[in-house]
Amino acid sequence: MKKKHRIKKNDEFQTVFQKGKSTANRQFVVYQLDKEEQPNFRIGLSVSKKIGNAVVRNRIKRMIRQSITELKDEIDSGKDFVIIARKPCAEMTYEEVKKSLIHVFKRSGMKRIKK
């Protein structure tokens, strides 16, 4: 994911948590906040230490980032997203992670996701 698509600062995460709406499935929670003045989407990732050690957490983040990279043309611009991984995603394959992200994005009301 390019820098323009990342949320890094704590106050930006907090804004999305407090003002955004959340959607969830068994593997992920997605907070979504509309930002009309923003030309593209931004995504922040959160993987708790409860999920596993650093190797497991980094693997999950890499799979999420790769899924987002493949879906970037279908994700609505002008929005901030925070994706929180839940414990079941520690044992998932890349295809399952991508499918689960598509599912939770569709539940959040994104019309452009087709896959």
Swiss-Prot record:
GO cellular component: ribonuclease P complex
GO molecular function: 3'-tRNA processing endoribonuclease activity; ribonuclease P activity; tRNA binding
UniProt keyword Calcium, yes or no: no
InterPro entries: Ribosomal_Su5_D2-typ_SF, Ribsml_uS5_D2-typ_fold_subgr, RNase_P, RNase_P_CS
Coiled-coil intervals: none
Signal peptide positions on this chain: none
PROSITE patterns given in the database record: RIBONUCLEASE_P
Tagged with keyword Nucleotide-binding: no
Protein name: Ribonuclease P protein component
Gene that encodes it: rnpA
